[in-house]
């Protein structure tokens, strides 16, 4: 594979692999909690602790395809570095949500709201990349450098709670 092509996606691939490890960690927590209270077999029902772990994992799994689509679309069509940064922030927030959900449910709310903001940022990056493609196609105007500058400048603002 061409090194330039790999360089264009390596950060996105790294964030994706980290997210896979995180998913495996969440699944391990569900399995561990199930076996701790149900013996050797896996049950979908059980104690309150198991219900919380299972629900937190399921909520994270439900949002995972959306995250991957906007991460890769934003990275490929707009700019890889801000998309990868936002992806790492999303994984951090998802971890915070998961751990918060295991305690009081109100502890998971900041992670949930922060995660929605990051998904929105990635969606807007994706939309800007698609819009730029059609502006080039129909009008010959390329705003790629401007879009990259704006997305790179705005991405650190994701750190503000």
Swiss-Prot record:
Question: Which GO cellular component terms are attached?
Answer: endoplasmic reticulum membrane; nuclear envelope; nuclear membrane; nucleus
Q: Name one GO molecular function term.
A: enzyme activator activity
Q: Where are the transmembrane segments?
A: 9-30, 53-77, 81-102, 116-128
In the UniProt annotation, the regions that are inserted into the membrane yet never cross to the other side are 108-115
Say which domain of life the source belongs to: Eukaryota
| UniProt GO BP | cellular response to calcium ion; leukotriene biosynthetic process; leukotriene production involved in inflammatory response; protein homotrimerization
Membrane side Cytoplasmic: which residues?
A: 31-52, 103-107
Key words, A-Z: Endoplasmic reticulum, Leukotriene biosynthesis, Membrane, Nucleus, Transmembrane, Transmembrane helix
Q: Write out the annotated subcellular location.
A: Nucleus membrane; Endoplasmic reticulum membrane
Q: By its UniProt entry, which InterPro entries does this protein fall under?
A: 5_LipOase_AP, FLAP/GST2/LTC4S_CS, MAPEG, MAPEG-like_dom_sf, Membr-assoc_MAPEG
> On the Lumenal side, which residues?
1-8, 78-80, 129-161
Q: How does it sit in the membrane?
A: Multi-pass membrane protein
Coarsely, its chief localization is nucleus
Assembly and binders: Homotrimer. Interacts with LTC4S and ALOX5.
Stated family? Belongs to the MAPEG family.
About its domains, the entry says: The C-terminal part after residue 140 is mostly disordered.
Which PANTHER family does the annotation name? ARACHIDONATE 5-LIPOXYGENASE-ACTIVATING PROTEIN, MICROSOMAL GLUTATHIONE S-TRANSFERASE
What is its biological role? Required for leukotriene biosynthesis by ALOX5 (5-lipoxygenase). Anchors ALOX5 to the membrane. Binds arachidonic acid, and could play an essential role in the transfer of arachidonic acid to ALOX5. Binds to MK-886, a compound that blocks the biosynthesis of leukotrienes.
Q: What protein am I looking at?
A: Arachidonate 5-lipoxygenase-activating protein
